[in-house]
C-alpha cells in the first residue's frame, strides 16, 4: 500500500560537506537524504513547483534511447524477451549467442562497444535539426547504468561495455552548444521486469535448466529474489513495480547519484513517480540541486507519465507515443521514436511528414516533442535516420519562428482531423498510431505577441482558407493587418472576411510538408 508522507516531524537540518542535506525519516522508510532547498519529499511541498520558462519555449528535444540492448539490433526489451521461450528474440539469441542458461544478457553487455560513437558530431546534427534540449539514456529496465555509477559498480558503461561515461560525454557535448541536458531513468521497473531471466525452458533439451538470472554471482544485474514468494519469477508481471524496500533504496541511491554527478536540467521517469516517499524525495532532491545552482531558482524539470502526479505543481506530464486531446493548461511533453525505442535493423521509420505534423500538432496544444533517433550498439546513426534528421533540419530552418517560444492560441486547430485523441484504457498515452493523417485542410495554431502562426498541414490547391481567422469567427481574432508565409520572400495575396482568412498560394513552396502562415493582428 502506498503511504503519503506528512510534513510533521519529517525534517531536521544536518550539516555535511560539501553539501547541506535534509534528513527525512519515517518509521517504515529508511533515512533518505536530499539536498537542502525549497522542497521536501512530500506531495504537499511539491505542489508549489512551477515549470520553468525554458521548457515552455524549447518545443523540441532529441533523445538517444541507447544502451546494451541496442547491440543485438533486435528492437525493444531484448534483455527480457530473450528469456521468453519461443519468442523471436529467444530464437535469435539461441542462434547468435547460445542458450540463456549458459549465455545470457550478461554476455550481451560486452558486445555494446560504441566504437563509432561521436557525441560531438551527433550533437552538431541535433542542434542543426532544431533541438533545444537533448536527453541521454541514464538507465533502462536492464539495470545497466550509462554513467560511472557508485551504486552499480560492475554493470555500468565505464566498468563494462564501451568503458566510457556515456551520460557525461553527452552532457558535455550538449552544454557546450547551449542545449539543456536531460537524462531518462527506467530503473524503477527493473526488479520484476527481469523475472523472465529467473525462469527456465518448459520443453526441449533444456527443460527445467535454470536461466543464468538464477546464478547468485550475477544478482547485481538480474536482482536477487531471495525473500520473495516462491513463485515470484513465474508470476511477476512486467513493470508491475513490485519490489522490496531494499530495492527501493537502491533505486533512490542510484538516481540520486545520477543527479549529483550530472545535474540534469530534465529528469524523465518511465512511469509515475515511483515508490512514493523514495520517488518524491528524488524529485525534491533534483529541484533543490537546481535551486542551489541557479541562485534559488528552480530551473529543473521532472517528467512523470501519471496525470495525477502533475495535476497541481510537482512535475511536467509526459505521454509516451501519445497526445492530449485539447490545449493543456501547463506545458507537457510527448515522447516518441521514429522507430523502435531500441535500435532494430530494417524497421520502417516515421516519415519526415509524420514527424513535422506531430511537432506542429503537439506545440499547438502547449506541448513539447521529445523524439528518439535510436542508435545501434556502434553509436552511429544509419543513413535512413540521417535522411529524416536532414528533412527535419530543413523544415525547422524555415519554420522555427512559429514553433519556438510560442504559446497556444484560443484553439489548437481546425479541419477534418480535430476529433479528440483516442484513449487507451482510459489513458492519453499510446494513441499516436490511431490518429488520422493530417491534410492540407488541417490547420494548427501557435501565437507570439500579436502574431498568429497558422500551420497548414500540406500544400493546398490554389488557396488556404482558415475559418478561425475570420474577423467574426467564434475565436474573435480581430483584424488581420498582414499575412506572410515563412520562407517565402514575396508578398502574398490575401483577404479577411467575417467568416475566414483566404490566402492565395505562391507559385513555389518554401518548404516540404506543413507551411506556416504568419498573420499579424492590428
Model-predicted regions and their roles:
Residues 28-522:
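Mature catalytic domains of secreted/periplasmic carbohydrate-active enzymes
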Residues 1-2, 17-20, 50-53, 59:
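A general, composition-driven signal for non-globular sequence regions
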Residues 2-3, 7-28:
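N-terminal export signals
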Amino acid at each position: 500500500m502506498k503511504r503519503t508522507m506528512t510534513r510533521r516531524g519529517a525534517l531536521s537540518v544536518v550539516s555535511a560537506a560539501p553539501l547541506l542535506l535534509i534528513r527525512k525519516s519515517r518509521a517504515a522508510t529508511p533515512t533518505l537524504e536530499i539536498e537542502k532547498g525549497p522542497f521536501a519529499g512530500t506531495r504537499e511541498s511539491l505542489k508549489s513547483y512551477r515549470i520553468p520558462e525554458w521548457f515552455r519555449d524549447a518545443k523540441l528535444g532529441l533523445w538517444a534511447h541507447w544502451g546494451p540492448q541496442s547491440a543485438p539490433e533486435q528492437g525493444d526489451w531484448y534483455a527480457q524477451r530473450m528469456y521468453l521461450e519461443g519468442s523471436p528474440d529467444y530464437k535469435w539469441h539461441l542462434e547468435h549467442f547460445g542458450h540463456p542458461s549458459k549465455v545470457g544478457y550478461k554476455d550481451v553487455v560486452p558486445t555494446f562497444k560504441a566504437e563509432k560513437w561521436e557525441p560531438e558530431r551527433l550533437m552538431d546534427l541535433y542542434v542543426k535539426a532544431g533541438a533545444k534540449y537533448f536527453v541521454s539514456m541514464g538507465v533502462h529496465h536492464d539495470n545497466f547504468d550509462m554513467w560511472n555509477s557508485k551504486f552499480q559498480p560492475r554493470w555500468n558503461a565505464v566498468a563494462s561495455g564501451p568503458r566510457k561515461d556515456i551520460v557525461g560525454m553527452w552532457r558535455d557535448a550538449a552544454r557546450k552548444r547551449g542545449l539543456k541536458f536531460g537524462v531518462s531513468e527506467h530503473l524503477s521497473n527493473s526488479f520484476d521486469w527481469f523475472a523472465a531471466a529467473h525462469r527456465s525452458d518448459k520443453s526441449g533439451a533444456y527443460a527445467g535448466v535454470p536461466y543464468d538470472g538464477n546464478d547468485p554471482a550475477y544478482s547485481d544485474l538480474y536482482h536477487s529474489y531471495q525473500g520473495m514468494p516462491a513463485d515470484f519469477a513465474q508470476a511477476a508481471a512486467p513493470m508491475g513495480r513490485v519490489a522490496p524496500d531494499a530495492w527501493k533504496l537502491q533505486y533512490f541511491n542510484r538516481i540520486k547519484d545520477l543527479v549529483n554527478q550530472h545535474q540534469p536540467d530534465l529528469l524523465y521517469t518511465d512511469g509515475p513517480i515511483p515508490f512514493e516517499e523514495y520517488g518524491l524525495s528524488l524529485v525534491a532532491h533534483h529541484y533543490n540541486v537546481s535551486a542551489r545552482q541557479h541562485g534559488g531558482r528552480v530551473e529543473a524539470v521532472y517528467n512523470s507519465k501519471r496525470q495525477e502526479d502533475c495535476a497541481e505543481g510537482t512535475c511536467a506530464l509526459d505521454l509516451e507515443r501519445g497526445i492530449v486531446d485539447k490545449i493543456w493548461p501547463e506545458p507537457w511533453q510527448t515522447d516518441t521514436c521514429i522507430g523502435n525505442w531500441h535500435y532494430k535493423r530494417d524497421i520502417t521509420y516515421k516519415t519526415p511528414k509524420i514527424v513535422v505534423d506531430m511537432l506542429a500538432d503537439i506545440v499547438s496544444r502547449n506541448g513539447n516533442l521529445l523524439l528518439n533517433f535510436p542508435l545501434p550498439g556502434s553509436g552511429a546513426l544509419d543513413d535512413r535516420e540521417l535522411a529524416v534528421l536532414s528533412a527535419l533540419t530543413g523544415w525547422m530552418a524555415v519554420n522555427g519562428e512559429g514553433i519556438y517560444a510560442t504559446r497556444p492560441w484560443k484553439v489548437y486547430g481546425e479541419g477534418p482531423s480535430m476529433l479528440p485523441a483516442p484513449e487507451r484504457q482510459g489513458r492519453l498515452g499510446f494513441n499516436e498510431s490511431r490518429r488520422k493523417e493530417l491534410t492540407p485542410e488541417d490547420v494548427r495554431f501557435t501565437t507570439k505577441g500579436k502574431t498568429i502562426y497558422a500551420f497548414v498541414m500540406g500544400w493546398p490547391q490554389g488557396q488556404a482558407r482558415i475559418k478561425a481567422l475570420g474577423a467574426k469567427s467564434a475565436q474573435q481574432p480581430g483584424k488581420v493587418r498582414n499575412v506572410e508565409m515563412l520562407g517565402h520572400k514575396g508578398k502574398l495575396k490575401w483577404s479577411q472576411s467575417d467568416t475566414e482568412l483566404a490566402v492565395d498560394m505562391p507559385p513555389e513552396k518554401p518548404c516540404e510538408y506543413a507551411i506556416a502562415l504568419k498573420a499579424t493582428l492590428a
